Amino acid sequence: MRIDPIVFRAKFPKRCSLEQCKSRCCRGGVWADVEEREIILRNADLFIPYLRPEAKDPSSWFGETAEDRDCPSGMAVETNVSGDYCVFFHPDHGCSLQKAAADLGRHEWEFKPRFCIMFPLVVSEGVLTVDEDMDEVWCMQRENRTDPILSAVEKEVSHLFPEEVSRRLLTEVYRRETPPAILSGYRPKKAAMP
């Protein structure tokens, strides 16, 4: 995986603020790895109580699949949209997958697609970069971007990447050095199989 140097210079708010943004990053759904879809469907009963009434049917949760080298399995699937938002979004608590996991005493991201956890970082065509396409979202507006992006999402980076990769990313941002162009041997973590 190559790293876009912008990752080391980009800014982000100190933390997400759902009160400010109203979860606008959940608009339009997201691409998930097909293995993540299978985990979500296997655990559907855990999430149904947290979903909006119009999104409770598991057969309506996912749409098209496509080849995607940025997914650990090589295949991506889109989450469907209900009322402009991802089917897993709920206006009272944000991501239903995350809320259910936390309420059940599990890791908050156990079921959440990695591309959701990763935002505002994204892997695109093998390059870790910043998703600048969502500039209308509160956290991506210039006046709200106050802290180094990697320090703002340090917990997410540590969760998503192997220890040596996350340590290297975080060390580089704190040193403010030029990043390595390529992290040899990087493979994204595969979704855990509950």
Where are the regions a protein language model picked out?
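Short loop/turn segments that flank or connect secondary-structure elements
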Residues: M1-P194
